[in-house]
Swiss-Prot record:
Protein name: Polyubiquitin-G
UniProt KW keywords: Cytoplasm, Isopeptide bond, Nucleus, Repeat, Ubl conjugation
Compartments, as annotated in UniProt: Cytoplasm; Nucleus
Gene Ontology biological-process annotations: modification-dependent protein catabolic process; protein ubiquitination
Gene name, Swiss-Prot/TrEMBL: ubqG
Protein function: Ubiquitin exists either covalently attached to another protein, or free (unanchored). When covalently bound, it is conjugated to target proteins via an isopeptide bond either as a monomer (monoubiquitin), a polymer linked via different Lys residues of the ubiquitin (polyubiquitin chains) or a linear polymer linked via the initiator Met of the ubiquitin (linear polyubiquitin chains). Polyubiquitin chains, when attached to a target protein, have different functions depending on the Lys residue of the ubiquitin that is linked: Lys-48-linked is involved in protein degradation via the proteasome.
Organism this protein belongs to: Dictyostelium discoideum
Length: 381
C-alpha cells in the first residue's frame, strides 16, 4: 500500500509499504529517498511517536495514511514547554543551551518576548545564565511557561462549569476592563458577566486594588442572561452542565442545548425534574422550573424504545422501555408517572389483555406501539 510522510518543511514523501513493515523498515525507506539517517528521524501518527520495533498494523496505519516526520538533531534533543492555557510547544535544543537561548526559541515560535517569560522545571524558576544540563533537563522533559507582565500580574477566573481562565491584569485595571478581557477570551458579553470575589459582587467602576485582589487570586464568574436564567443538568456520572435558558424554552430546545455542549443526540436524552420525565413539547415554565433548578439527564440507550399508553380519558403517556421488559415493569413505570397502582391497571394491545409475566416482545409490541390502559377499581372483578 502507499502511505505519505509529511516533513516539517511541508514536503510530502510517498512510500510503498506493507502493514507488516516495522517502523525501522519505514525509516530505512525514508533514508533511501531523502538521505536522512534513521537515528535522526521521529515518526508521528495520530499524535503518537512510533516505536522502531512495532509494525504499521500495530498502529492501525492504513493505505494513504499520513505520518509526520520530525528531525532529531545529533547531540540534540527535544523538550516540551507547557503554557498555562494547556498548549504544548516542542523545542529542539542541546543540553549546553542556556535558558536565554531557550526563551529566544520560544519567542521565535510564539512571539512572547523573553523578558515576559518565566520557565519552571521541577518546581524551580530557571535562571537565564544557567544551561539545561545545569538543571538536569533531559530529552522529552517538560518545562512550564508562566507569563510575567511588566508591572502586571496573573489572576484566575473560575466559571460555574469548573473551567479556569487565566488573565493578565494590572492592579489598576477596573472591573469593566477585566470583563472586556474575559469577553476577548471567551466571547461572553460584559453585561452578561457577574464577577464574585470573597463573596462580594464586583462593581464595574472599581479597580482590582480596591478589592485587594492580588496576583493569583481567583474570581468566580456567574452568567447573567437578559430575561434568562441558568439551570443545571446533572448526568448519571455526576457531571453537572450549566445551561442558559428562558422559561419559555421548550424541552426540545433544552435537549438541543445539551447536544451543543455534550454531543448527546436529543433522541437519547431523557430529562427528569421533580421525579417526572419532561415532554418535548412542554416548556420549562410548564414544569415550574426556575433559575438554578437542577434537572437530571438519563441516557436512553439505542436498544430501548418509546411506547405510548392511552387512557380512557384520552390522555397519552410516553414510556421508555426495552423489548425485554415484562408487563409488570411497564405497570410500575405507569405508576411512577401517573400514581396508579399496578393492581388497578389493565393493559390492552391488539384487543388482548396483557399478562404480568410476559414481555413486550412476546406480544410483538414495537417502538411507538400504543397500549390502552383500562382501570380496574378496588373491589371490582
Amino acid at each position: 500500500m502507499q502511505i505519505f510522510v509529511k516533513t516539517l518543511t511541508g514536503k510530502t514523501i510517498t512510500l510503498e509499504v506493507e502493514g507488516s513493515d516495522n517502523i525501522e523498515n519505514v525509516k530505512a525507506k525514508i533514508q533511501d529517498k531523502e538521505g536522512i539517517p534513521p537515528d535522526q528521524q521521529r515518526l508521528i501518527f495520530a499524535g503518537k511517536q512510533l516505536e522502531d520495533g512495532r509494525t504499521l498494523s500495530d498502529y492501525n496505519i492504513q493505505k494513504e495514511s499520513t505520518l509526520h516526520l520530525v528531525l532529531r538533531l545529533r547531540g540534540g534533543m527535544q523538550i516540551f514547554v507547557k503554557t498555562l492555557t494547556g498548549k504544548t510547544i516542542t523545542l529542539e535544543v542541546e543540553g549546553s543551551d542556556n535558558i536565554e537561548n531557550v526563551k529566544a526559541k520560544i519567542q521565535d515560535k510564539e512571539g512572547i518576548p523573553p523578558d515576559q517569560q518565566r520557565l519552571i522545571f521541577a518546581g524551580k524558576q530557571l535562571e537565564d545564565g544557567r544551561t539545561l544540563s545545569d538543571y538536569n533537563i533531559q530529552k522529552e522533559s517538560t518545562l512550564h511557561l508562566v507569563l510575567r507582565l511588566r508591572g502586571g500580574m496573573q489572576i484566575f477566573v473560575k466559571t460555574l462549569t469548573g473551567k479556569t481562565i487565566t488573565l493578565e491584569v494590572e492592579g489598576s485595571d477596573n472591573i469593566e476592563n477585566v470583563k472586556a478581557k474575559i469577553q476577548d477570551k471567551e466571547g461572553i458579553p460584559p453585561d452578561q458577566q457577574r464577577l464574585i470575589f470573597a463573596g462580594k459582587q464586583l462593581e464595574d467602576g472599581r479597580t482590582l486594588s480596591d478589592y485587594n485582589i492580588q496576583k493569583e487570586s481567583t474570581l468566580h464568574l456567574v452568567l447573567r442572561l437578559r430575561g434568562g436564567m441558568q439551570i443545571f443538568v446533572k448526568t448519571l456520572t455526576g457531571k453537572t452542565i450549566t445551561l442558559e435558558v428562558e422559561g419559555s424554552d421548550n424541552i426540545e430546545n433544552v435537549k438541543a442545548k445539551i447536544q451543543d455542549k455534550e454531543g448527546i443526540p436529543p433522541d437519547q436524552q431523557r430529562l427528569i425534574f421533580a421525579g417526572k420525565q419532561l415532554e418535548d413539547g412542554r416548556t420549562l415554565s410548564d414544569y415550574n422550573i426556575q433559575k438554578e433548578s437542577t434537572l437530571h439527564l438519563v441516557l436512553r440507550l439505542r436498544g430501548g424504545m418509546q411506547i405510548f399508553v392511552k387512557t380512557l380519558t384520552g390522555k397519552t403517556i410516553t414510556l421508555e422501555v426495552e423489548g425485554s421488559d415484562n408487563i409488570e415493569n411497564v405497570k410500575a413505570k405507569i405508576q411512577d408517572k401517573e400514581g396508579i397502582p399496578p393492581d388497578q391497571q389493565r393493559l390492552i394491545f391488539a384487543g388482548k389483555q396483557l399478562e404480568d409475566g410476559r414481555t413486550l416482545s412476546d406480544y410483538n409490541i414495537q417502538k411507538e406501539s400504543t397500549l390502552h390502559l383500562v382501570l380496574r377499581l378496588r373491589g371490582g372483578l
